[in-house]
Structures are given as C-alpha cells and as structure tokens.
Regions:
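Helix-adjacent hinge/juxtasegments
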Residues: 10-51
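Short, small-residue-biased leader/transition segments that mark boundaries at the very start
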Residues: 3-5
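Short coil/turn connectors at secondary-structure junctions
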Residues: 22-26, 71, 92-96
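Small-aliphatic-rich amphipathic alpha-helix that forms the alpha element of a beta-alpha
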Residues: 28, 43-87
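Solvent-exposed alpha-helices and their adjacent loops that cap or buttress functional pockets
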Residues: 20-22, 90-92, 112-114
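C-terminal helix-cap and adjacent tail motif
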Residues: 98-126
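Short, conserved aromatic-histidine micro-motifs
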Residues: 83-103
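Short secondary-structure boundary segments
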Residues: 32, 78, 104
Length: 126
C-alpha cells in the first residue's frame, strides 16, 4: 500500500543522510502488506517473493506518472524506518520499504552517460 505525506516535518524526519529530500513537497511511503494465502502459497511453489515484484511495478508506475506530469522523483530506501513509522502511525507489524519523493526539480537534468545497448542487452543467451 502507499501513503502520501504532505507534512514537511513528518516528511523530513528519519531521512538521515537524504537531507535533500526534506525539500520535496510530497513523499509517497510504500508499505509492505501481508500476503494473502494464495500469494503466499504461490510464492512458496515458485520460489519468488511476489510482494517485492508488485512493489517494484507500482514504484515504476508512480515515477513514470510523475515524469509524464513534468515532476521529478527520487526513490529512497535508506531512512530511519522506526522513526517514520512512529510519526506516521504505520503499524509496527508493517514494513516501510521505500519513500518516493515527488516535486519539481530544482534544476534541469544533466545528460546522463549510459552504457551502449550491446553492453546491457543480450538476445537468446545470457
């Protein structure tokens, strides 16, 4: 599940070394819910942890939607989980996995240096 925080005090708490994120007007907290029995059994049979796959898909869509609206985003995984859970009322039995910050970028994006396609894509064989 996701939780949106727009209180700058709560948003900045527990961010530790991510000081830049305190200026973001919106923080979307990604919270892991317990699996239902079908997902649990499927995960055991397939040896895959489906909640993390689902969280990855949801996070990608959130950041892509922000980008399509001209907003910037940053996915944070390094924060004080206990502190943020205490301030936001997230139950102790839930896991806070990510903080996705959303806002208007302070400056234009720099051109990124990317590896060539042949270095990251393979066909028919790894």
């Amino acid at each position: 599940s996701e939780m949106c925080i727009r209180d700058s005090g709560k948003a900045a708490a527990g961010l530790g070394m991510n000081k830049f994120a305190k200026d973001a007007p919106v923080h979307i907290l990604v919270v892991e819910e317990s699996m239902n029995i079908t997902s649990f059994l499927g995960a055991k049979i397939k040896d895959k942890y489906f909640p993390l796959i689902d969280i990855g898909i949801a996070t990608a869509h959130i950041t892509l939607a922000a980008e399509s609206e001209g907003l910037g985003s940053c996915i944070l995984g390094w924060f004080d989980e206990k502190e943020i859970k205490k301030l936001t009322g997230i139950p102790a039995n839930k896991r806070l996995l990510l903080d996705i910050t959303i806002g208007y970028p302070a400056k234009d994006k720099r051109k990124k240096s990317r590896k060539s396609k042949d270095k990251v894509v393979s066909y028919n064989h790894y």
